[in-house]
Amino acid sequence: MADQKIQIRLKAFDCRLIDRSAGEIVETAKRTGAHVRGPIPLPTKIERCTILVSPHADKDARDQYETCTYKRVLYIVDPNDKTVDALMKLELAAGVDVQIKLT
């Protein structure tokens, strides 16, 4: 697997969960002898929603809710077969979305 990189993008609603998962990936890759760059934090996407509390006639009474989506990216440089096998067997938390791209 000469001159190849593995790009791993993580996405989650909980920042502690995503940091723990990124740490597990980094530890697994380093244990197999690969070089890791990251985790690199990407911009957080914040979605806000405003809801009227009163059923009618009181426009000033509102509640605001927000959802934050945290993202991280990792690059594994010069992966070997052991690295790929270890990453495939790795169990991450249920709330983390993982996208893997081989370049």
Curated annotation (Swiss-Prot):
Q: List the molecular function annotations (GO) for this entry.
A: structural constituent of ribosome; tRNA binding
Transmembrane segment boundaries: none
Pfam families the record matches: Ribosomal_S10
Listed Gene3D superfamilies: Ribosomal protein S10 domain
What SMART domains does its record include? Answer: Ribosomal_S10
Assembly? Part of the 30S ribosomal subunit.
What is this protein identified as? Small ribosomal subunit protein uS10
Q: Which organism is it from?
A: Xylella fastidiosa (strain Temecula1 / ATCC 700964)
Q: Which gene encodes it?
A: rpsJ
